[in-house]
């Protein structure tokens, strides 16, 4: 009984019932779920394959958004974007999430820096940050090589479980990366009272399927600024003491 739908491809939208204003292009696109959602757009074999009641989702690429069921407002670009093991994990019931590509993406090129919304008129309950020098001193920068769990086992199997995979070096990348261990940063944040349970995790994120931690590296900048300010105050105080001698 749906209206204003455009469906192109074998098995595309095969189980749709009341969904409206949807566009499904590609074999088995939105083909497995009983679709009641509206205003979804996908192109690619198996894109949005499990979609049910979700709406306003956009998926481009083979198997893009393959796990989405009731999630809404998601944008999934590239092969396997939103599948278990991809950077955002399995996007199923999550809302308003953007995922670019799968775990094989190695480089993103862009001409300019990202501009992130930060208008003070849109913020409330503003208080000074209390994470600074002590937090930074406790961080442990490391170098490492990726050996992704998602490259072990058959991630296309119905019963695939990322948590059951144990890397053994077989699929280790040959290039070095630099950063922090997300779980270690999580522990530091929690010790300071910034917990995910209270929705106060600052730099650490966990995918909606609970299987992969990530870090928001740009959010370390305010903490680093606070640390520099605290260190500058200490230097000024010591300089004043020396001058007074």
Predicted regions: what they are:
Residues 1-119:
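Glycine- and small/polar-enriched repetitive beta-structure motifs of secreted/surface proteins
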